[in-house]
Amino acid sequence: RDASSRFHPSHRWGNFWSVGAAWIVTKENFMSGTHGWLDMLKVKASIGSQGNDKIGDYRYVDTYRLASSNGEMSVAFLEKGNPNITWETNTNFNAGIEFGVLQNRISGSIEYFNRKTTDMLMAFPTAPSLGYSSYYANVGDMSNKGIEVDLNFTPIRSKNVQWDINVNLTHLKNKIISLPPERRTKEVEGYYGYAGSSFFYGQGLPLYTFYMKKYAGVSEDGRSMWYKDVTDKDGKPTGERTTTTAYSEGSDYLCGNAIPDLYGGFGTSVSFFGFDFGINFNYQIGGKIYDSGYAAAMSTPTSTGSIGVNWHKDILNAWTPENPNSNIPRMQYGDSNTTDTSDRFLIDASYLTLQNINFGYTLPSKFTQKFGVGKMRIYLACENVFYWSKRKGLDPRYADNTDNQGVLGTSNYATYSPIRTISGGINIQF
């Protein structure tokens, strides 16, 4: 049982619990016939709940700020509060196995997880005419289901040589299970929910589903085009689409989501006659990210203040009468819609990073003991060696969100990728 001062006293307390069990099957008598090849087999399961109150302070009351003008102080409205918000609850179920075979030359774990989130805490957007843009509310339920696999291999193991390989992967499916009626204010492609920023939160959809205009290329005179629904006399879509050069007339569509299909890491290490070498990679496959940095670098000048700004090299391939087949609109002073939000700037968020490389040598003990040293290792290491992504300069790991995990799906060029570091040293044990 826990309480949080971030909620109204009437909703401050929450009850959370957990229980788990494991069974080492290989210790049972009926498994005695497998001891020649099966070293360990464990079956495990757990279920429990935990609360989330990470929404900031005083979200349950209206807040105000002091403002100064011409030496006079006044009180101005800051944020809208909601006294009904309460704990977001995550109920986690995990079940899996751990195993080791062939003298643990092959070992690992396989685990299924099902995480259900109820009473999701999110900022709910409102009409600007209300005097505030959003307020926090418990907006619905969500599930994350998937599988985690961790495998370890030792192809070579001898007195002086050992080679290890490790691979891990995670696959998950995210879905909004339910939204209360007051949140189902809009229907998009058969899903009911609400729109906020560049996302649509709908029942049956992943949480971070992009909702924006679809880019349709350039017109014959080089202007940007967007798709637009054809409607009947009652204003209802007929299922057909046309194009328009007016951004405000373009229709919004579901454009994929930011959650990857697969992510994890892999690596290998080798030790031989005192030398050791290791290398590790991280990866992500699938998901989308909105590359706002690229959009800014492809914008056209809108004022004299644009003098001196730089562009991406792709701008050199923009439409011109001599280059009529380009998919990049013409450079036109004052065109403020060229880089407005659309799936033109959505990009595959897959990446591969060479996380670290290390190399070392451990001196023979018969040599170090002459100096009263039990063990001495000389090493050289490099961290954050390299990463590959769909576009040079784009690092999907550092998106515009609070946990820097790239989940929110919006690039943030104000956040630098980790710097590459090269280090070396000597480890001494007495």
Describe the predicted segments one by one:
Residues 19-23, 95-99, 110, 149-153, ...:
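Residues on the lipid-exposed face of transmembrane beta-strands in outer-membrane beta-barrel proteins
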Residues 1-5, 25-27, 47-51, 103, ...:
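Transmembrane beta-strands of outer-membrane beta-barrel pores
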Residues 139-144, 189-221, 316-318, 323, ...:
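C-terminal beta-signal and terminal closure region of outer-membrane beta-barrel proteins
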Residues 4, 284-377, 382, 400:
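Extracytoplasmic gating/loop element in the C-terminal half of outer-membrane beta-barrel translocons
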Residues 137, 154-258, 298, 316-320, ...:
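Conserved small-residue
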Residues 60-61, 68-107, 135-158, 204-207, ...:
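Outer-membrane beta-barrel signature, preferentially recognizing the C-terminal barrel domain
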Residues 26-41, 102-105, 156-163, 176-181, ...:
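Short loop/turn motifs that connect adjacent beta-strands in outer-membrane beta-barrel proteins
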Residues 32-89, 107, 111-142, 195:
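Solvent-exposed loop/turn elements at secondary-structure boundaries
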